[in-house]
Regions:
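Flavin-dependent oxidoreductase catalytic cores
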Residues: 1-358
């Protein structure tokens, strides 16, 4: 099933292999996509669906060095280079919109931008900046109602730009401890207003973003990525997490989204997401379901055959194997990635991995 054509709502896909979103930090000029990024994604257009790296809908969401944005015309033009290149190879591509929230340092933000989050609690640990090296995370300003309304509007405007730039859809990043999950997670969200204090309160921001984006570009063009039980960026399980996410996903299902994307980081050393919640979310979402997390050919095929997923997402193997689909199909050995070039500017470790299956 892995290599069979399929449909994702109105999209026709050449196979059920998805390229997972992965930060690569190559948007070196004003957080704007470029020809090098277009080449990178076009090399990987053999995937049934590409999900881009996390892309900020706001200057305030550019927490990491050199990640791309999509909130102005020049960034939209840069992304048009990418979508044109992928479509020229017969691929399909959606953009992942990711506001980093408190996972940020002010040195990584453009002039006039600020670090914001659900509360003023600082994320423990450090992050890399080009100008100052490793630095403790910056203190966020707690978002007001006006801030929340503004960010929701930024997501909708960015989604509109995405469609104008030629994307086949948009994925909202609701995992890995970034802004949407900062509201969802009971360990992080300590608000006492209508955006916290209960499961419904914690779900509210995510649903407002989803509904605003769906209203702007159509629900059938909007996917979302979630990871209950994820531990990235000081999240982690909390009391009632399973019940909260089932309630969230039932509401998302009723909106009629493009897909639900469930992430499990256990292959990278994090605790596994319990099988029960994966199955519960699969049951709660009446639409296409993508699973990600450490799959190879055999386990990906098993997930499809057993009905656990409709599509299977692969991450790091795509970094060093641009022809991953053909390698999996022909059982060709995979090239190991160079971890030292994951986030460095330039072509090395980005567009210079060889194709072995031509």
């Amino acid at each position: 099933m892995l290599f069979e054509p399929t449909t994702l709502r109105s999209l026709s896909l050449r196979n059920r292999v998805v390229m997972s979103p992965m930060t690569r930090s190559r948007a070196v000029e004003a957080n704007t996509p470029n020809a090098l990024m277009a080449e990178y994604y076009a090399q990987r257009a053999g995937a049934g669906l590409i999900i881009t790296e996390g892309t900020s809908p706001s200057p305030n969401g550019l927490g990491y060095a050199r990640i791309p944005g999509l909130y102005n015309a020049s960034q939209a033009a840069g992304w048009k280079l990418v979508t044109d290149a992928v479509h020229a190879k017969g691929g399909k591509i959606v953009i992942q919109l990711m506001h980093t929230g408190r996972v940020s340092h002010a040195a990584n933000l453009p002039a006039g931008a600020e670090v914001v989050g659900p509360t003023a609690a600082v994320l423990p640990g450090e992050m890399y900046t080009d100008s100052k090296g490793m630095q403790p995370h910056s203190a966020p300003r707690a978002m007001t109602q006006a801030d929340i309304d503004h960010v929701v509007a930024e997501y909708a405007a960015s989604a509109q730009l995405a469609i104008e730039a030629g994307f086949d859809g948009v994925e909202l990043h609701g995992a890995n401890g970034y802004l949407i999950e900062q509201f969802l997670n009971g360990n992080v969200n300590q608000r006492t207003d209508g955006y916290g204090g209960s499961a419904a309160g914690r779900n509210r921001f995510a649903l407002e973003v989803v509904r605003a984006v769906a209203k702007r570009i159509g629900a059938g063009k909007v996917g979302i990525r979630v990871s209950p039980h994820g531990v990235f960026n000081a999240t982690g399980p909390f009391d009632g997490v399973d019940e909260q996410y089932v309630a969230l996903v039932k509401e998302l299902s009723a909106i009629g989204l493009l897909y639900l994307h469930q992430l499990d980081h256990s292959a990278m050393g994090a605790p596994a997401v319990p099988a029960g919640i994966k199955a519960a979310l699969r049951d709660a979402f009446k639409g296409p379901y993508i699973l990600a997390g450490g799959f190879d050919r055999a386990s990906g095929e098993k997930a499809l055959q057993s009905g656990q997923a409709d599509l299977v997402a692969y991450g790091r193997p795509f970094i060093s194997n641009p022809d991953l689909v053909e390698r999996l199909k022909k059982d060709v050995a995979l090239t190991a990635p160079d971890f030292s070039t994951f986030y460095t500017p330039g072509a090395k470790g980005y567009t210079d991995y060889a194709v072995q299956t031509a």
